[in-house]
Amino acid sequence: MAKIGIFGGTFDPFHQGHLKIAVEAAKKLDKVIIVPTICDYYRPDSRKLFTFDEKVAIITKMISNAPGNIVIDSLEKDKDSMWRTINTVQYFKEQYPNDELYLIIGEDSYKNFPTWFRYEDILLMATLMVVQRGNSKDDLVKVVPCEELYIGKDFLEASSSKVRNKLISELMEMYLDDADWYNKF
């Protein structure tokens, strides 16, 4: 029986922190499947920086030098906004019926996990693998049973929103420089 990790997220954009999580999880699991999602249920009005296809291209490029047991699956590309984590877990349970599934989520998502749609059913099909960062392995307050993936205090403190804001700022600066915008006033 293989251990299969499902690592889903909006990944807008996918960054070095996400890659580190996938690499660390791949050390404990037989396979890690990165699953970019179509929408963010907790921030439905959030601004999108990249299209789904662009996110897939970025992830594919970033995992090209990662261990071979890290792959990407774009199953959510053609799904509507009603597609949820439970649907993704069910899909992979059908693909890997005799294997053990792990749903890889961050500590922030884990704290809200009991509010997820059909979270009890998710737990029947998959073990949660919670990415824990910080100074101590004992910091995680358990809200539901889970396995911990301790990244450590030297974990790259990156977030998609920080990366997105930096990209937008740099792109805007490039645009303004190219357009000679400042000299028009």
Enumerate the language-model features and the residues they cover:
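Nucleotidyltransferase catalytic core that binds NTPs
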Residues: 1-185
